[in-house]
Amino acid sequence: MKELALWQEVQADLQQVEAELLRQVDAPDPVLSQAARHLVQAGGKRLRPAFAILAARCCGAPLERILPLAVALEMIHMATLVHDDVIDASPIRRGRPTVWARWGQELSLHTGDYLFARSLILVATYDDPRIPSVLASVSVKMVQGEIQQLAAAFDLDITLRDYLDRIYRKTALLIAASCELGAIAAGADTATIRHLRYYGRNLGLAFQITDDVLDMVADPEQLGKPIGGDLRQGVITLPAIYALQASPKKQKLIHLLGKRDKTQAEIQEAIQLIKDCGGIKYALDIAEGYLERARKQASYLPPGVARDTLTSLTYYIRTRGF
């Protein structure tokens, strides 16, 4: 992340998460172990373990209670990334070759499956039945979100409701679960668990919307991959949904977005049309609405540094560059 001051609140804890991640992904097979370690060492924001840790801190729980869960959440997230890269045939992620690009499809799929299976072992260390129950439900819905996205590829009739349902399943659910499960593992009361779940849900929706915006406007070096990846794959995101209704050059945009073999120049042209009619601003305004809802939920949490950090994260999400 923006190694901002607010993230320093959990930096030491995230270092322990990182060390435990590397320990957990070791496999008897050296190639599988190498592929899994490659994925961990590619880095990332580690948002999901951070949210679980901050949620637990709101409730006064030590890292020891939350560490297995925090690592499991990141492993589930990494498993989805490996599978995404296979589906999208993505050669680069976070500025490094993907597991798919380096080891091929079969090992990539096995690596994702292995990470998910290892996460189950960690989750099984908790006695509270709500923890595996929530994660099982979330995992099913995440897969449904991925299938929704595949089924809707190049579908220019996608609605705002369709889009929000897809990103809720694909992204927001796991962030909401990270907050909720951090509170459950910490022994929080029902109201605190609910506020943290809704905080994560709203922040997760805003995070994915801004991620979709960044795919059109970010610096490719900061992003770690070329921009326009969604348009190339036929994934119609919120800025494009708005532009398909509002652009004075709607027919041109329909032609560009509907093409299955776009050149980079055509992708850039489509992005410019989306920008020109206000698609980026519209999407960011929608994201800001969800961030405001997240701040409202955070205001109900016990006062302290953890709550302040959760609130500060809502402002970071809106202004991040990658």
Please state what every model-predicted region is.
Residues 1-322:
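All-alpha prenyltransferase/terpene-synthase fold signal
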